[in-house]
Amino acid sequence: MEASSWLCYQARGFGSSRVWLWLLLALVLLNCSLVLSASPYLVGMGSFDITGPAADVNMMGYANTEQIASGIHFRLKSRAFIVAEPNGKRVVFVNIDACMASQIVTIKVLERLKARYGDLYNENNVAISGIHTHAGPGGYLQYVVYIVTSLGFVRQSFDVIVDGIEQSIVEAHNNLRPGKIFVNKGDLLDAGVNRSPSAYLNNPAEERSKYEYNVDKEMTLIKFVDDELGPVGSFNWFATHGTSMSRTNSLISGDNKGAAARFMEDWAEQMGLPKQSAHANSDDLRSLHKTSVLPRRVSTIIPEPNEITDDLIQLASSYEASGGRRLAGSSITRRIRSTQQNKPKFVSAFCQSNCGDVSPNVLGTFCIDTNLPCDFNHSTCNGKNELCYGRGPGYPDEFESTRVIGNRQFLKARDLFDSASEEIQGKIDYRHTYLDFSKLEVKVSTSAGGQQTVKTCPAAMGFAFAAGTTDGPGAFDFRQGDVKGNPFWKLVRNLLKTPGKDQVECHSPKPILLDTGEMKEPYDWAPAILPVQMIRIGQLVILCVPGEFTTMAGRRLRDAVKTVLTSGNSEFDKNIHVVLAGLTNSYSQYITTFEEYQIQRYEGASTLYGPHTLSAYIQEFQKLAMAMIANKEVPTNFQPPDMLDKQIGLLPGVVFDSTPLGVKFGDVNSDVPGNSTFNKGSTVNATFYSACPRNDLLTDGTFALVEKLDGNNNWVPVYDDDDWSLRFKWSRPARLSSRSFATLEWTVPEDAAAGVYRLRHFGASKPMFGSVRHFTGTSRAFAVR
């Protein structure tokens, strides 16, 4: 019987209205089923500027007192994703372009989220992770040892990070929409090398034989796909240090991971992601990215490239420098990327993993005086550690090394993004607790095959900590691999705090240089209470750790957790993906294996809680995993201190800014040459009379613009200080001078459109009396071939 005849029959027998009602109900239920099947999660992405003070503030990472911020390479961001079950649990993961997470930052972000959303987001389901750039402003951690070189706490650094994290989460929350998640992984072979191979070799040979490399080469990526807009972002985890930029760099930079994120997001924007319409075509994406070069941002309203003619050069010469002028504060925010989009923006984060002993300086370590390789065991040159440096792929150009390592991560992430096909499915879950790592009891195996109970120790740093690493050597006569110490430096140490016998024995064979865990004046020097957290999104499990795990330490932790999750009657199968998110929620320096600790290179000397620190982490994460399997909560008996009110900051504020008589802020000091034409790859620069960037951070704004003359003789912004090609450099003629200069340096991209351009500077000056005043000024115009 045909369907039409059957329907007529049913209508005669039971009444047509009743049949149509049932059919309509069936269609609705079928449609709901399809929607639920297609949208297992709600997914939201967000990002916000956290660049911070671009002047006067010591940079966090190298502990070099002379590394003071004086401009911007490109901006720092907080990037967040939220994944939620439509009627269940949700998790937030935030990746910040900062050296590490900070306990006090995490505390204050959670307070703000509670005030805004109640109990929806809390310490259990929110993770905040740092990429470990060594080129961001410091002073945002609360423990003394991490803010000594920044002259204490820097409120501006702290506030901009807290604000930016909150705003990125708010944006992600507001963007929550039905979507899917895919996971993919693959090896990236040329973005990291082991900087402490002698310590790695002390791990058991049987264990080392299981791995092809002495660093982790695997990148794990998750791809977020909105049901209507298509791909909206990606996060990946890969281990390599943020030390492509050196200890002498003074420009704020996200280093290689920040660069990779910038490249990935620019590539996505070139492709028009997220799409305005549903169902992005993967074939279109593949064909597009195969032809793309290093991504850049350029305004979409710029016309087709102009052919350079004499008339165009003459046109450029008719536009002289504008001279400085006052601005309303709202006029300074002229980002190339519009924040007023009618669709979510594409967000891509390159997260950190077990990078403790992984360097991006892949060419090896060499003595700067002889060009010979450094000593293998101690990383010294004729006994001096300060002469041994690692070399990046762009050596001697640190910017090129940063670009190359960032681009390699971007290209691998792009390939994984494009080929991701394994869909993440399953419930969302999380476990979190705080532990006192200064006295944690740990059961460890003995050589006889039994078990014994040992303890972790109050925090302490060894002599080799002061030797630094091949990414950033220390000073004086310290060296890596020192298990004895030096009588002179022990005398100096004792002026601060003499470690007791129990502390010395607990940390053995580490010779203690700084007994930070027992130093309490003016407040705690090092943390004792630390968070451990495990997040589950389907078959993806993220281990959130507050420190830098070495390669083998991270492998042991991942394997231990995976063994627990896949044993017995667990709902997890062998296809589980376990990633380690380093430098998350708080910071406690390094975690080595027991065997690596014995060698006392930099990483071992910086393992704060003694030789059994890793065993403690493994034990406690196994407990989290067992609790997750059993669907049990994890008790929390400790809380980290909130020491914000105790913070001491000794960095002086800006007193006032000035210019020479007859000169305005924004006037040009050194202009682009008149009647000039520049080729692709050449560099254009102009210097302006400026003021201290600390007067206004121009958050989500810009200090620098490249503008292009369009066909209607309007100046249109095409590059800003978040672009790879444009650098903002700030300087004073003397340390205590009230005068300052801003140099805008633009390297013309190879794919820049030919035409007429100029440079524009934005800033804010502080008078002796009154409020901050914003200003701008432009260079004379020039032609680009």
UniProtKB/Swiss-Prot annotation:
Class of this enzyme: hydrolase
List cellular component terms (GO): endoplasmic reticulum; extracellular region; Golgi apparatus; membrane
Is Glycoprotein found in the keyword set? yes
Q: Tissue range of expression?
A: Expressed in seedlings, with higher levels in roots than in shoots.
Q: Name one GO molecular function term.
A: N-acylsphingosine amidohydrolase activity
pH relationship of activity: Optimum pH is 5.7-6.
The catalysed reaction is: an N-acylsphing-4-enine + H2O = sphing-4-enine + a fatty acid
Has the keyword Aminoacyl-tRNA synthetase been applied to this entry?
no
Tell me the active site: S359
Glycosylation is annotated at N31, N377, N675, N685
How's its activity regulated? Enhanced activity in the presence of calcium, magnesium, manganese and zinc ions, but inhibited activity in the presence of iron ion.
Query: Keywords in UniProt for this one?
Result: Endoplasmic reticulum, Glycoprotein, Golgi apparatus, Hydrolase, Secreted, Signal
Q: Which domain of life is it from?
A: Eukaryota
A Gene Ontology biological process annotation? ceramide catabolic process
Enzyme Commission (EC) number: 3.5.1.23
Per its UniProt record, what InterPro entries does this chain match?
Ceramidase_alk (IPR006823), NCDase_C_sf (IPR038445), NEUT/ALK_ceramidase_C (IPR031331), NEUT/ALK_ceramidase_N (IPR031329)
Query: Where is this gene product found?
Result: Secreted; Endoplasmic reticulum; Golgi apparatus
Pfam families this protein is in? Ceramidase_alk (PF04734), Ceramidse_alk_C (PF17048)
Where is it mostly found? secreted
Q: Which family does it belong to?
A: Belongs to the neutral ceramidase family.
Q: What does this protein do?
A: Hydrolyzes the sphingolipid ceramide into sphingosine and free fatty acid. Uses ceramide instead of phytoceramide as substrate.
Query: Could you identify this protein by its name?
Result: Neutral ceramidase
